[in-house]
């Protein structure tokens, strides 16, 4: 490996380390905010405040707080020199970490409780940030830093697109190839010998009986139109017997095909799981890529996407869509469509989705992007 390749390799490794450190710090900052909101009424965490919970629980909360605050401070120390390489989303994460750390003292106490610093700063942090921005712009190495940040964002985009294509194409290819060359021949060969490979098919038999009845009526109708004498009983019985055998073979084929679909879907699920497990680092990169894309949208675009998603899955017209989806899945798997199950699913699952979504807006989106929540309320017609 050439010297340039070694340098690029270690540069990419350093970029991934920065991303991982920043992600850990961001999650720790969110944890601290959650503790403040849930237990301290959106105020600072203090050890001298009685929470009305058992002492063991309060001690656990303080331990989690101290560990998260230590991670935030360590993150700031490790990523401060590489601030110029961060994209917009990562800078927002870094600002959240700085905001959390600035609310507390810099030194962790040696005792069991965190010391809360409320001393005024000599200069506002915004002014210090302005001076730091000017210093970075005048730095002779700033151009290299910007280029390194661009390369890291480009690598992040390429990795995200690659893992997205792998997550889509690999399960589909495995499903088609395994179904056509492995599962289908094996099921066709073993289904006559192994009865459990054939579904019980009362629904298919009902459909076959209905088709046979319609076929008999068509024969009688054609006989009345095309000849003066109706079909004899033996001729009618023979034609119906041939049609019954044809319908039976068709029902057996549909039953066997449902078994093939089940095994093909399982192979696709296994392939998807393997890709996810083998590409965990790439999935974290893709998560950051999509976070940046989502946060780059305007408030109106975010609100529009949220309203579109909720109206499709939990809106007024969503029951029809869920009915079509469930019936399609049941047909694909060879299962009879149960109207009671469909109605129960429609009555419960969209409600659960709506509850989760409202909780997400209250606990996460309302803190990260309050303007998006205000725009969402205005577009949705609620106060």
Curated annotation (Swiss-Prot):
Q: Where are the transmembrane segments?
A: 163-183, 258-278, 306-326, 341-361
Q: What is the first-listed, main subcellular location in coarse terms? A: membrane
Task: State a single Gene Ontology molecular function.
Answer: proton transmembrane transporter activity
| Localization annotation | Cell inner membrane
- Keyword Thylakoid, does the record have it? no
Gene Ontology CC terms, in alphabetical order: plasma membrane
* Keyword hit for Protease: no
Task: Please report the record's description of how this protein sits within the membrane.
Answer: Multi-pass membrane protein
**Pfam families attached to this UniProt entry:** CemA
List the keywords (alphabetical). Cell inner membrane, Cell membrane, Hydrogen ion transport, Ion transport, Membrane, Transmembrane, Transmembrane helix, Transport
Coiled-coil region = none
Family as reported in the entry's similarity comment: Belongs to the CemA family.
The job of this chain, per UniProt, is described as:
Required for H(+) efflux immediately after light irradiation to form a rapid H(+) concentration gradient across the thylakoid membranes. Together with PxcL, contributes to transient H(+) uptake following dark to light transition.
Q: From the Swiss-Prot or TrEMBL record, give the protein name.
A: Proton extrusion protein PxcA
């Amino acid at each position: 490996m050439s010297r340039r390749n070694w340098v690029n390799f270690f540069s990419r490794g350093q970029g991934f380390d920065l991303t991982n450190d920043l992600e850990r710090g961001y999650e720790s900052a969110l944890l601290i905010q959650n503790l403040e909101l849930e237990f301290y009424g959106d105020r600072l965490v203090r050890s001298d405040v009685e929470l009305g919970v058992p002492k063991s629980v309060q001690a656990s909360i303080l331990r989690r707080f101290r560990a998260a605050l230590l991670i935030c401070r360590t993150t700031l120390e490790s990523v401060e020199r590489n601030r110029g390489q961060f994209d917009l989303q990562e800078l927002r994460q870094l600002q959240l970490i700085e905001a959390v750390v600035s609310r507390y003292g810099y030194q962790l106490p040696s005792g069991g409780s965190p010391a809360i610093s409320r001393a005024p700063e000599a200069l506002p942090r915004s002014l210090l940030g302005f001076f730091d921005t000017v210093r970075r712009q005048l730095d002779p190495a700033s151009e290299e830093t910007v280029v390194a940040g661009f390369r890291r964002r480009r690598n992040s985009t390429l990795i995200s697109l690659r893992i997205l294509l792998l997550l889509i194409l690999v399960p589909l290819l495995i499903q088609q190839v395994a179904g056509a060359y492995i599962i289908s021949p094996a099921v066709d060969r073993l289904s006559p010998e192994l009865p459990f490979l054939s579904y019980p098919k009362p629904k298919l038999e009902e459909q076959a009986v209905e088709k046979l009845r319609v076929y008999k009526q068509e024969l009688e109708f054609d006989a009345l139109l095309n000849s003066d004498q109706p079909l004899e009983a033996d001729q009618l019985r023979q034609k119906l017997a041939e049609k019954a055998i044809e319908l039976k073979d068709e029902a057996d084929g549909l039953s066997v095909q449902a078994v093939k679909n089940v095994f093909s879907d399982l192979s696709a699920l296994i392939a998807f799981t393997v890709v996810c497990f083998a590409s965990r680092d790439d999935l974290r990169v893709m998560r950051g890529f999509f976070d940046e894309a989502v946060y780059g949208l305007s408030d109106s675009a975010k609100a529009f996407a949220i309203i579109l998603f909720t109206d499709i899955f939990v809106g007024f017209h969503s029951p029809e869509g869920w009915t079509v989806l469930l019936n399609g899945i049941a047909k694909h798997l060879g299962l009879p469509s149960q109207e009671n199950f469909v109605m129960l699913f429609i009555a419960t699952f969209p409600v659960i989705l709506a509850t989760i979504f409202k909780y997400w807006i209250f606990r996460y989106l309302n803190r990260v992007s309050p303007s998006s929540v205000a725009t969402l309320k205005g577009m949705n017609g609620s106060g």
